[in-house]
């Protein structure tokens, strides 16, 4: 309904501009303008659907990324995400393993 209202407002604005300046448009010009407006509305409607699809996928992939990072932290894998500066790491629980900081994990078991 909002798109129809936008199109109607745009057509009325076009009619007002044409009427105010006394510009005479031929039937072909009027038809071309109306067709262009209709094409742009159809394109906008298609893009709105694509936006919704991407937003849905982005939310699900963001959730997947969050779950993956939590799982990595629980397993003690390196996810500190910082570079060693003067041999120290600023993130709590991380140690310097040049050139990156790694999360402290369980000690290695001797074979």
UniProtKB/Swiss-Prot annotation:
The presence of a 'disulfide through disulfide knot' structurally defines this protein as a knottin. GO terms for biological process: defense response; killing of cells of another organism. Pfam families: Cyclotide. This is Kalata-B7. Belongs to the cyclotide family. Moebius subfamily. Residues 29-75, 105-111 form a propeptide. There is a cross-link at residues 76-104 (Cyclopeptide (Gly-Asn)). The keyword Disulfide bond applies.
């Amino acid at each position: 309904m909002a798109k129809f209202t936008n199109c109607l407002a745009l057509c009325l604005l076009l009619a007002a501009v044409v009427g105010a300046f006394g510009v005479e448009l031929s039937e072909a010009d009027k038809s071309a303008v109306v067709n262009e407006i209709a094409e742009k509305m159809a394109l906008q409607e298609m893009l709105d659907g694509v936006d919704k699809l991407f937003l849905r996928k982005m939310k699900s992939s963001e959730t997947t990324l969050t779950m993956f990072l939590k799982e990595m932290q629980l397993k003690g894998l390196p996810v500190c995400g910082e570079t060693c500066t003067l041999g120290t790491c600023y993130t709590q629980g991380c140690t310097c393993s040049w050139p990156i900081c790694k999360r402290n994990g369980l000690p290695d078991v001797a074979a």
